[in-house]
């Protein structure tokens, strides 16, 4: 080990580790390098999208599953011609399908942009404003909570204990007269 470097049993040249487990910034021992290479990092921005099941969390199960039978129904005894009923079904289904696709094509990306900005702002405000305000409030309220606790233990506890002892001997007899 001369000059701050050493050679392992396989002939690889390494710098001297800063600590026994290796450099915390850059792994320079084989065990740490292998351990880091085995870990798989998953990023929410690079995950694959399921093009078959587009509602995996079932957000829209009750709301938008509208079929022809959910909207238009003819009761017994009041039926239109079979051809009209079939044409109405086809017209409704195809119109709903293609108009949804048209609206998605026109407004899907702008709406995704708007909702992405909205939730980014919401996340930003929650992380950088709401949580720090709540933590600050909890720190500041500790002083008041201690004073309040002392007040309750020195004034309220004895007072309510005395009132409880006064009324502990009260007996109520209910008689039902017929």
Swiss-Prot record:
Q: Where is this region: Interaction with CAVIN3?
A: 82-94
Instruction: Print the keywords alphabetically.
Output: Acetylation, Cell membrane, Golgi apparatus, Isopeptide bond, Lipoprotein, Membrane, Palmitate, Phosphoprotein, Ubl conjugation
Any intramembrane ranges? 105-125
Q: Does the keyword Cell membrane apply?
A: yes
Superkingdom of source = Eukaryota
Record-linked PROSITE patterns:
CAVEOLIN
Q: Where is this region: Required for homooligomerization?
A: 2-94
Indicate yes or no for the key word Lyase: no
Entry's InterPro entries? Caveolin, Caveolin_CS
- Residue ranges for the region (Interacts with SPRY1, SPRY2, SPRY3 and SPRY4) are 131-142, 167-178
GO molecular function, a single term = nitric-oxide synthase binding
The main place the protein resides is: Golgi
N-acetylserine carried by residues: 2
For side Cytoplasmic, which residue ranges?
A: 2-104, 126-178
Sites of Phosphotyrosine modification: 6, 14, 25
Cross-referenced Pfam families: Caveolin
Q: How does it assemble?
A: Homooligomer. Interacts with GLIPR2. Interacts with NOSTRIN. Interacts with SNAP25 and STX1A. Interacts (via the N-terminus) with DPP4; the interaction is direct. Interacts with CTNNB1, CDH1 and JUP. Interacts with PACSIN2; this interaction induces membrane tubulation. Interacts with SLC7A9. Interacts with BMX and BTK. Interacts with TGFBR1. Interacts with CAVIN3 (via leucine-zipper domain) in a cholesterol-sensitive manner. Interacts with CAVIN1. Interacts with EHD2 in a cholesterol-dependent manner.
Give the similarity note: Belongs to the caveolin family.
Name of the featured protein: Caveolin-1
Q: What is the lineage of its organism?
A: Eukaryota, Metazoa, Chordata, Craniata, Vertebrata
What would be the name of the gene that encodes this protein?
A: CAV1
């Amino acid at each position: 080990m001369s000059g701050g470097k050493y050679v392992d049993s396989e002939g690889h040249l390494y710098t001297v580790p800063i600590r026994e487990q290796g450099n915390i910034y850059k792994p320079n021992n084989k065990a740490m390098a292998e351990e880091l290479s085995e870990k798989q990092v998953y990023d929410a921005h690079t995950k694959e999208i399921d093009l078959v099941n587009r509602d995996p969390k079932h957000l829209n199960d009750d709301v938008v599953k509208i079929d022809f039978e959910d909207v238009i129904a003819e009761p017994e005894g009041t039926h239109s011609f079979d051809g009209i009923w079939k044409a109405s079904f086809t017209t409704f289904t195809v119109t709903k399908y293609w108009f949804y696709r048209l609206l998605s094509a026109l407004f899907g990306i702008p709406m995704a942009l708007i909702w992405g900005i909205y939730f980014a702002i919401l996340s930003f405000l929650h992380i950088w404003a709401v949580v720090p305000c709540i933590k600050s409030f909890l720190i500041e309220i500790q002083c008041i909570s201690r004073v309040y606790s002392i007040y309750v233990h020195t004034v309220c506890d004895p007072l309510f204990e005395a009132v409880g002892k006064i009324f502990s001997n009260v007996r109520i007899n209910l008689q039902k007269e017929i």
